[in-house]
Swiss-Prot record:
SMART domains: BAR (SM00721), SH3 (SM00326). It comes from Gallus gallus. This is Endophilin-A2. Keywords: Cell junction, Cell projection, Coiled coil, Cytoplasm, Endocytosis, Endosome, Lipid-binding, Membrane, SH3 domain. InterPro entries: AH/BAR_dom_sf (IPR027267), BAR_dom (IPR004148), Endophilin_A_SH3 (IPR035824), Endophilin_SH3RF (IPR050384), SH3-like_dom_sf (IPR036028), SH3_domain (IPR001452). Gene3D superfamilies: Arfaptin homology (AH) domain/BAR domain (1.20.1270.60), SH3 Domains (2.30.30.40). Pfam families: BAR, SH3_1.
Length: 367
């Protein structure tokens, strides 16, 4: 730095100290200038804040944003043209739905519905990617350019103006001790910088319709995204409702328990002093009151075992009309399965309903 430059820096520093510490009065700028400066400062803060919040709106996960920034930097270093995109939450949800939909298989209503929903979520992610690109091109990039160019240039002019004001005020305070020509030059430079700064701020504020246009582009992009999203979700909702209608119109598949294996070991003499093996009967609430009586198997109306029948495991006392009563050990002819809990059968010429869990199926009903 030249001697003249060092002297100028000393003048400005000295004037700044006298104003901050000594309370010296500096040259006042007019109210119109200060009002423009205030509006420009607010514009700068607004643009910076809106840019930050827009990026957070499009890419809400900070960890994913940081990772994406790192990957984009690495791609530039490696000279890769295509950069990885932001992992949209709709896409991640869709991948999860599709994975489990495939695992559940086509036999599952839920699995098929998950596949439908997963494909729709992936379509939503693609639409969201398009929104990101559209907003970046027509909103984020223009505002970023405003920050990097116009606002930065205004800040440069204001900083230069402040420096020349300090230089001018220092020399004005020492009027008579410095040449008049030097004071005149300092005043002219100050006035020149003020005019340049004033012009640049005026141009920015008068052309703020450009920012309105950019904001309109943001809203248009959002509208387009939401229209497509509504269309995708409407189609998905209709698919799911159609699946529900189809499922409700199909006959319900009744659960058919496999018949239990029965063992009938007759008494036989063993050459080695063997024993007879008979299964221990299950004890029911009703049979517990008859525990002093010997176990017996009913011989009433025993049907041929070539027709559907079952064996009573417990006593059943009918409580309602249409129910069929029986005793433990009775053999009951099966005529129909009402639902997953009740059979219809006959014994001793009487027919009625009885609970499935009171009997053991010997010969199941035909499918």
């Amino acid at each position: 730095m030249s001697v003249a430059g060092l002297k100028k820096q000393f003048y400005k520093a000295s004037q700044l100290v006298s104003e901050k510490v000594g309370g010296a009065e500096g040259t006042k700028l007019d109210d119109d200038f200060k009002e423009m400066e205030k509006k420009v400062d607010l514009t700068s803060k607004a643009v910076t804040e809106v840019l930050t919040r827009t990026i957070e709106y499009l890419q809400p996960n900070p960890a994913s944003r940081a990772k994406l920034t790192m990957l984009n930097t690495m791609s530039k270093i490696r000279g890769q043209v295509k950069n990885p995109g932001y992992p949209q939450s709709e896409g991640l949800l869709g991948e999860s739905m599709i994975r489990y939909g495939k695992e559940l298989g086509e036999d599952s209503n839920f699995g098929d519905a998950l596949l439908d929903a997963g494909e729709s979520m992936k379509r939503l992610a693609e639409v969201k990617d398009s929104l990101d690109i559209e907003v970046k091109q027509n909103f984020i990039d223009p505002l970023q350019n405003l920050c990097d160019k116009d606002l930065k240039e205004i800040q440069h002019h204001l900083k230069k103006l402040e420096g020349r004001r300090l230089d001018f005020d220092y020399k004005k305070k020492r009027q008579g001790k410095i040449p008049d020509e030097e004071l005149r030059q300092a005043m002219e430079k100050f006035e020149e910088s003020k005019e340049v700064a004033e012009t640049s701020m005026h141009n920015l504020l008068e052309t703020d319709i450009e920012q309105v246009s950019q904001l309109s582009a943001l809203v248009d992009a959002q509208l387009d995204y939401h229209r497509q999203a509504v269309q995708i979700l409407d189609e998905l909702a209709e698919k799911l409702k159609r699946r529900m209608r189809e499922a409700s119109s199909r006959p319900r598949r009744e659960y058919k328990p496999k018949p239990r294996e029965t063992y009938d070991f007759g008494e036989s003499d063993q050459s080695n002093g063997g024993f007879s093996c008979t299964p221990t009967p299950k004890v029911s609430a009703s049979s517990s009151f008859r525990s002093d009586k010997p176990f017996r198997t009913s011989v009433r109306s025993i049907p041929h075992l070539d027709q559907p029948c079952c064996k009573a495991l417990y006593d059943f006392e009918p409580e309602n009309d249409g129910e069929l009563g029986f005793k433990e050990g009775d053999i009951i002819t099966l005529t129909n399965q009402i639902d997953e809990n009740w059979y219809e059968g006959m014994i001793n010429g009487q027919s009625g309903f009885f609970p499935l869990n009171y009997v053991e199926v010997l010969v199941p009903l035909p499918q």
